[in-house]
């Protein structure tokens, strides 16, 4: 009899545990690679405070993530390192910004979450003694340095292209001359600099901080525009309320403190209405 009671008790406990696991909400977050460190820390805090929710984070270049969403990947929240990628999924944007008239953003959910800076960084020993973007320009013109930057579909690469154009530099000619190497996301560019395989690279100031790199110079808005990170709930989300709750949490004090510790700035005061 005692054995029977024990077996029944075990079965009841297993059933309860199974029910508890079944009730867990899985929230899929697509986020720019530059958010890896901060969002990984935030994920732990959020899951501890909300044990009924499990965050599944997919970090990559914003262009790659946008393509995955467009091709039908499951995504509840998308946080991009640039407006372009979200614009291309947002039906409320005009035809110039969303020429394919894609409609993946849940109406009313889009916000401007964070601001970052574009930074010039070098390996620890700064082999070329580069001191600024101005000096880098002259060195590139003379073919004296090797610079790493993001691919054309990567926001940090798009910002870097604008900086090159600001200085009147021809990216294609520099690449053909072997003076530019590329990374598929900002982490790859950062790694090239950390490993000393290039003389310098253009990354976000937050990635420089996370990698322990010194920022040599910071691009102004006149050089490449402001670096705004938009975020939105996706229209095909099966858990839109949970997705919105997480987005609201990201704007809160606890999450924003983590973002700001590595150099992000809150955009809450300028939030898109």
Regions found by a protein language model. Name each.
Residues 72-74:
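Charged, often glycine-rich, active-site loop that binds/positions anionic groups
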Residues 104-106:
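Alpha-helical scaffolding within the catalytic cores
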Residues 16, 23-49, 58, 63, ...:
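Exported/periplasmic ABC-transporter solute-binding proteins
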Residues 76-80:
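Periplasmic-binding protein-like
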Residues 2-22:
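Sec-dependent N-terminal signal peptides of Gram-positive bacterial secreted proteins and lipoproteins
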């Amino acid at each position: 009899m005692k054995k029977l009671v024990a077996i029944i008790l075990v079965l009841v406990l297993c059933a309860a545990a199974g029910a508890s696991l079944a009730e867990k909400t899985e929230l899929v977050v697509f986020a720019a690679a530059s958010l890896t460190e901060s969002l990984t820390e935030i994920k732990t805090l959020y899951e501890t405070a909300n044990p009924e929710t499990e965050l599944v984070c997919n970090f990559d270049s914003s262009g790659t993530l946008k393509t995955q969403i467009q091709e039908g990947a499951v995504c509840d929240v998308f946080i991009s390192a640039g407006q372009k990628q979200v614009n291309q999924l947002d039906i409320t944007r005009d035809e110039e910004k969303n020429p394919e008239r894609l409609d993946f953003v849940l109406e009313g959910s889009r916000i401007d979450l964070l601001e970052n800076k574009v930074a010039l960084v070098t390996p620890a020993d700064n082999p070329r003694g580069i001191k600024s973007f101005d000096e880098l320009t002259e060195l590139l013109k003379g073919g004296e340095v090797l610079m790493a930057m993001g691919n054309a579909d990567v926001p940090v690469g798009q910002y870097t292209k604008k900086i090159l154009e600001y200085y009147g530099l021809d990216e294609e000619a520099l690449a053909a001359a072997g003076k530019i190497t590329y990374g598929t996301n900002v982490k790859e560019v950062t790694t090239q600099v950390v490993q000393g395989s290039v003389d310098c690279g253009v990354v976000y100031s937050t990635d420089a901080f996370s990698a322990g790199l010194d920022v040599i110079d910071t691009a102004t808005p006149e050089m490449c525009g402001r670096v705004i990170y938009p975020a939105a709930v996706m229209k095909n989300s099966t858990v839109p309320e949970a997705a919105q709750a997480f987005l609201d949490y990201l704007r809160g004090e606890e999450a924003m403190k983590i973002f700001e510790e590595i150099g992000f700035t809150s955009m809450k005061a300028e939030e898109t209405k």
